Regions:
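Short intrinsically disordered terminal tails
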Residues: 1, 80-86
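N-terminal acidic leader/helix
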Residues: 2-42
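Short, charge-rich amphipathic interface segments used for partner binding and complex assembly
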Residues: 44-82
Length: 86
């Protein structure tokens, strides 16, 4: 499961940053979920949802939520998926 290895740190002093981190983390978990399903079933729906997550990481909104480079986020998620066999 995706964890804070993407350097999404907790910031209890800034609840808005905490919320932004939670949104980014959930998008990563969603990507993993759909990639796992796509690996198993090869359904277009799962592929398009994966791409939707990738597009989110490159969106202006995601860039407002985190300072982490979207390519770094996606690369770390893909490495974790490969490590787990999907």
């Amino acid at each position: 499961m995706l964890n804070a290895n993407v350097n999404v740190s907790r910031d209890v002093e800034n609840p808005y940053k905490e919320l932004g981190n939670a949104i980014i983390l959930q998008a990563g978990k969603d990507y993993i979920h759909y990639r796992k399903r796509f690996h198993k079933h090869h359904k277009d729906f799962d592929y398009f949802r994966m791409k939707e997550c990738e597009n989110f990481f490159h969106s202006d909104w995601a860039q407002l939520l985190t300072d982490i480079d979207p390519f770094v986020i996606i690369e770390k998620i893909k490495k974790e998926c490969k490590k787990n066999g999907y």
